[in-house]
Amino acid sequence: MAFNLRNRSFVKELDFTPQELMFLITLAADLKAAKYAGTEQPQLSGKNIALIFEKTSTRTRCAFEVAAHDQGAHVTYLDPSGSQIGHKESIKDTARVLGRMFDAIEYRGASQATVEELAEYAGVPVWNGLTDEWHPTQMLADFLTIMEHTDKPLREVTLAYMGDARNNLGNSLTVTGAMLGIDVRMVAPRELWPDEERVAAPARAIAETTGARVTFTDDIAEGLAGADFIYTDVWVSMGEPSEVWDERIRQLLPYQVNAEALKATGNPDVKFLHCLPAFHDLGTEVAREIHARTGLTALEVTDEVFESPASIVFDQAENRMHTIKALMVATLGR
């Protein structure tokens, strides 16, 4: 079935129906195959796209820039040091200015209200590259990766997320898992579960219509049993003060994804997902600082798991580009 998503914004997962999300994922798979085969046809020639980054990025920025280039579009990168956005010019005014100059706008920053205001006033498609509440473009990449690494239909897939489940990734996985009909489990301390009113209750309501199973548990054995995929994220998100590290380590060290966690699934074919960057070794300044204070050589995932055959994190990272390209083509293409 074809869908017309032209001129639609994507600021949170619920902007689209489950069928529309699956259309985007399928389109991404087709665009990926075309890129590999050398048969990709540009559909965004002459388009101009603004990339607003109030938060730093490697994967998201590169994914948008390469996807746009592949499709013939031009991008303009705007960061806080190079624009007046939110400082000397309101978001509403910025949206109306950029909407006159650009064909679409990507926003990555703290405030969900900001990306929603951009979408309300710009008059062109606006895409959420990440906010503190939601990470919708990551979900497209995650579920393309899941579909590439299982022979099961999604309704038979079990995904267990370990760690801080109240962050943007936990929110998005809970809702998207419900929308796409999987068995999605948030395995985390109770104080780090997603917000009941904003995330958990809507996800349960969606699950009643899609056949999904949505579980919140602090019981690691229960949460991991039979899982096809284990997913984790950093324990301290961008924008949080560094002082919270010690408390978060105390809360989440039992929820580290390690060899024992993989074994607890009882599934020899279990796969590991992470949206990256990951603190799996001492290769970063932050990790070395934490090691000096705590003696830990890894945080949310051990190096053993990260570098194991179970790890599909770099397939997942690549798929950011293919799925973002699908979003751009579907909402902006000719």
UniProtKB/Swiss-Prot annotation:
Gene3D superfamilies from the entry?
A: Aspartate/ornithine carbamoyltransferase (3.40.50.1370)
> How is this protein annotated for GO cellular component?
cytoplasm
Task: Report the superkingdom from the record.
Answer: Bacteria
**Which reaction is the catalytic activity of this chain?**
carbamoyl phosphate + L-ornithine = L-citrulline + phosphate + H(+)
State where the protein is found.
Cytoplasm
Q: Transferase: is it a keyword of this entry?
A: yes
The protein's UniProt keywords, in alphabetical order, are: Amino-acid biosynthesis, Arginine biosynthesis, Cytoplasm, Transferase
Binding site residues for carbamoyl phosphate: S57, T58, R59, T60, Q84, R108, H135, P136, T137, Q138, C275, L276, R320
Cite the GO molecular-function annotations of the record. amino acid binding; ornithine carbamoyltransferase activity
Q: Which residues bind L-ornithine?
A: N168, D233, S237, M238
Family matches, as InterPro entries: Asp/Orn_carbamoyltranf_P-bd, Asp/Orn_carbamoylTrfase, Asp/Orn_carbamoylTrfase_sf, Asp_carbamoyltransf_Asp/Orn-bd, Orn/put_carbamltrans, OTCase_ArgI
**Does this UniProt record's set of keywords contain Transferase?**
yes
EC numbers for this chain:
2.1.3.3
Q: Which GO terms describe its biological process?
A: arginine biosynthetic process via ornithine; citrulline biosynthetic process; L-arginine biosynthetic process
Biochemical pathway: Amino-acid biosynthesis; L-arginine biosynthesis; L-arginine from L-ornithine and carbamoyl phosphate: step 1/3
Family note = Belongs to the aspartate/ornithine carbamoyltransferase superfamily. OTCase family.
Please explain the role this protein plays, according to its UniProt record.
Reversibly catalyzes the transfer of the carbamoyl group from carbamoyl phosphate (CP) to the N(epsilon) atom of ornithine (ORN) to produce L-citrulline.
Annotated protein name in UniProt: Ornithine carbamoyltransferase
Q: Which organism is it from?
A: Thermobifida fusca (strain YX)
Q: What is the lineage of its organism?
A: Bacteria, Bacillati, Actinomycetota, Actinomycetes, Streptosporangiales
